[in-house]
């Protein structure tokens, strides 16, 4: 009886362990009863999803074509293991990605989440070096980076606000540098022959603070990775499929391994992929069983997920999304041009992303509920208020989101 009463008071909080929150302090989450287009619906409200449900819902909700593709595949068969079996959707998606991605990024290893796909990329790079007799053990990454929440991803990241459980000993083989040329040159001169890989979120660092940096840094990093024979990994889980204003940053600078997730399936079902070039793949291709990549997620290459990804990519190409993303960026530029406030440290935007960084994170307390009352779902983090726009968003909806963000500051009392 006591447990039943607690459930009535707390609702689902008793049974669900939510992410990135101290459960004892957590406010009751908004309960979604429907979603369509760019809108989320609660029992008594309608709000624009300004963050694309953690940056993945590029086509919005209830896209009929994706729903139909998934339904058709479910009616045929919903899943088979990829060990010893294969199927048409995974073959088609692999072929499509081979054509869709730049250079010789041809070899697809599928996973069920972005974090796992990053783990696979790091494992590939490390074993690639082991297979060729190299004793390299160090990993190079960036400050303010985030690559996921599984163990190697936590080590690669530089995000103490998320992964404070790691000790210095846990990260002894990882070096983090800022996105500055001098730091890049120095670390390669000092440790270049010790690195098995350099992993980056290219151009846009997401959960580490929405930091943006120059393509010139990546171009020089590519040259140094070539010079020191270091595997260059692009974590494009968040940046891929147009988020930076480029289809992929890999179109501008070619990595050895690219990781895709989130928008790969447009958020309709979890799936991710690690794609390697010929050099990496050939480092495993031999007569030795011990050279094989010993990894195999249960749901890798799930046929329903592959069907969703194929349809999502088809829509992305057919609807000329790169023009849509350019329009979003141009409109955001006009809407924030000249806007300043003492609480705001910097306003940044790139492609389909807008970020207000504040001096003091406490000034964002209450913004989520404020936005909700104004018909916008937002979820600020650290010292960041941001939007990751769905690509189907209309001009009036962009304006509504940006106005809510700006008005929060202009309505602050005593500032």
Region spans (language model):
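Conserved N-terminal phosphate-binding loop of PLP-dependent enzymes in the Aspartate aminotransferase
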Residues: 2-415
């Amino acid at each position: 009886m006591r447990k039943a009463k607690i459930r009535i008071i707390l609702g689902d909080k008793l049974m669900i362990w939510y992410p990135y929150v101290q459960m004892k302090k957590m406010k009751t989450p908004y309960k979604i009863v429907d979603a369509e287009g760019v809108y989320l619906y609660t029992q008594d409200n309608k709000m624009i999803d300004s963050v694309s449900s953690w940056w993945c819902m590029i086509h919005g909700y209830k896209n009929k074509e994706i729903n139909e593709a998934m339904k058709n595949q479910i009616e045929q068969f919903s899943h088979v293991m990829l060990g010893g079996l294969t199927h048409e959707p995974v073959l088609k998606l692999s072929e499509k990605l081979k054509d869709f991605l730049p250079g010789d990024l041809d070899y697809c290893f599928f996973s069920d989440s972005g974090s796992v796909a990053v783990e696979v990329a790091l494992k590939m790079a490390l074993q690639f070096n082991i297979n060729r007799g190299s004793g390299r053990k160090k990993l190079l990454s960036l400050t303010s980076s985030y690559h996921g929440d599984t163990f190697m991803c936590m080590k690669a990241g530089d995000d103490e606000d998320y992964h404070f459980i790691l000790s210095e000993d846990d990260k002894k083989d990882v070096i983090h540098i800022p996105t500055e040329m001098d730091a890049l040159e120095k670390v390669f001169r000092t440790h270049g022959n010790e690195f098995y890989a350099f992993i980056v979120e290219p151009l846009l660092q997401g959960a580490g603070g929405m930091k943006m940096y120059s393509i010139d840094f990546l171009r020089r990093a590519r040259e140094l990775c070539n010079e020191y024979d270091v595997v260059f990994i692009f974590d494009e889980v968040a940046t891929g499929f147009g988020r930076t204003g480029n289809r992929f940053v890999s179109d501008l600078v070619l990595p050895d391994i690219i990781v895709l997730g989130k928008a790969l399936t447009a958020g309709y079902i979890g799936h991710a992929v690690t794609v390697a070039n010929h050099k990496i793949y050939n480092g495993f291709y031999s007569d030795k069983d011990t050279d094989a990549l010993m990894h195999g997620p249960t749901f890798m290459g799930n046929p329903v997920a592959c069907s969703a990804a194929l349809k999502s990519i088809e829509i992305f190409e057919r609807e000329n999304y790169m023009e849509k993303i350019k329009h979003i960026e141009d409109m955001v530029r006009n809407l924030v041009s000249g806007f300043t406030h003492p609480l705001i440290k910097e306003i940044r935007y790139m492609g389909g992303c807008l970020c207000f960084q504040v001096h003091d994170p406490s000034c964002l307390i209450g913004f989520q509920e404020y936005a909700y009352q104004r018909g916008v779902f937002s979820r600020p983090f650290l010292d960041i208020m941001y939007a990751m726009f769905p690509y189907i968003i209309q001009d009036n909806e962009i304006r509504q989101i940006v106005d809510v963000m700006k008005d929060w500051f202009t309505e602050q009392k005593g500032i």
